[in-house]
Amino acid sequence: VIGTPDGNLYLNSTGNPGMATAGSGDVLTGIIAGLAAQNIPLIESTIAGAYIHGYSGDIFSKNETQTNLIAGDLIRNLPETLKQVLP
């Protein structure tokens, strides 16, 4: 769940329990920062970043297992994730 100061709530439908691993939050922060650095408004960067982050974890869990996931796997899956998510 992503909440904004004005009270809006956004629910991210991607991701899985295997992503609760060391460094996963750092990857999420990097994705959000990368989007924000492209002058995408911060709330949109946060919503998109959370979706992309979770989708990357979902790709890994489909190809491997949730229990083996490490933060580097999320980064390695970003090119495939972006191909599938972005128009």
Model-derived segments and spans:
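Small-residue (G/A/S/T)-rich helix-start motifs and N-terminal tracts that mark the onset
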Residues: 1-87
